[in-house]
Amino acid sequence: MTAEKITQGTEGLNVPNEPIIPFIIGDGIGPDIWKAASRVIDAAVEKAYNGEKRIEWKEVLAGQKAFDTTGEWLPQETLDTIKEYLIAVKGPLTTPIGGGIRSLNVALRQELDLFTCLRPVRWFKGVPSPVKRPQDVDMVIFRENTEDIYAGIEFKEGTTEVKKVIDFLQNEMGATNIRFPETSGIGIKPVSKEGTERLVRAAIQYAIDNNRKSVTLVHKGNIMKFTEGSFKQWGYDLALSEFGDQVFTWQQYDEIVENEGRDAANAAQEKAEKEGKIIIKDSIADIFLQQILTRPAEHDVVATMNLNGDYISDALAAQVGGIGIAPGANINYETGHAIFEATHGTAPKYAGLNKVNPSSVILSSVLMLEHLGWQEAADKITDSIEDTIASKVVTYDFARLMDGAEEVSTSAFADELIKNLK
């Protein structure tokens, strides 16, 4: 078997039996969790395919290790390698201290145009949770990754640049509602039709491919009408224009109410649900954040903008055990580029202690295996995590909240996962 690159074809990824996959080990606890995760992934692939498939890992540098080795936090060689090999896995990266140095995670997303942050959130039986019915949480978040307030277009208070922006807004655009112009910083919030459409397209296609029931567009369009309000409308328009016979939208529902009455609209939606159509609906963000606590079962796939998505992803993760068990991926569904990553931070005080939970990067690697079409290996890891947690053999973060738990180290938890692969 010869190791080869993954390539992008007209029908999606072309995945060889021995793909070369770059990895960034990460800072802080990164080496601990990656050592554990890579053993679990390799064991699952071996068990699923009896040696007919395997991954050749290729380390690339970013973060502290890159800086110590090359003097750069994110070397161009790393970006070029990920661009060439399409798929990568990464541990947590620290953002270097100092003005003018942007987040390495954001830099990777922007350089590779990874427009979707994919965050599936579900509960594993036995995981400690602060809510009464964590089993009702089963959502997949599609967070737009390149626009919104997180685009990084900001101007610091008191600078020449911000004075120019404020002067332009006041004198050229007639803005009168900058309350304290002399001491304001300014951030720009770009939200585009193209950026919205590619995100919503990916979310609806995911819902279709994975037999999901609905896609909720989450926004604050009631206040920010020309950015978040446009996101909602562009999302609905895209759903009908590209997926018309596979979806039923709330805007269609409202039109039927207006023309034929609510009973007719309810009947139309019920018929669409029986036919297996995806229900496209929307929710104002603050109401949505209440509903994920009070009735989470009503939401399935979620498509939202960058800032909303950041809040929603971590709020949902808290309901099912925290970001220590929350997977994430950053994907460009058009070019095939994707980075699968731990969603938590570097936790430097635990670095090298062989103590922390490696589940986030392991489950992110499960997403990677699913993305590659290696579902058998992905399922083996997921089942093993379920069985291992159910047996109460867990790392300290869960053990301290579970009665009768056996606390184990990072590496011992990986050993247990490998033992429980079926």
From Swiss-Prot:
This is Isocitrate dehydrogenase [NADP]. It comes from the Bacteria. It catalyses: D-threo-isocitrate + NADP(+) = 2-oxoglutarate + CO2 + NADPH. D-threo-isocitrate binds at S103, N105, R109, R119, R143. Catalyzes the oxidative decarboxylation of isocitrate to 2-oxoglutarate and carbon dioxide with the concomitant reduction of NADP(+). NADP(+) binds at T94, H344, G345, T346, A347, P348, K349, Y350, N357, Y396, R400. One of its GO terms (molecular function) is NAD binding. It is an enzyme of class 1 (oxidoreductase). Belongs to the isocitrate and isopropylmalate dehydrogenases family. SUPFAM superfamilies: Isocitrate/Isopropylmalate dehydrogenase-like (SSF53659). Pfam families: Iso_dh. Binds 1 Mg(2+) or Mn(2+) ion per subunit. The keyword Transit peptide does not apply. Its cofactor is Mg(2+); Mn(2+). The record marks Y150, K220 as: Critical for catalysis. Homodimer.
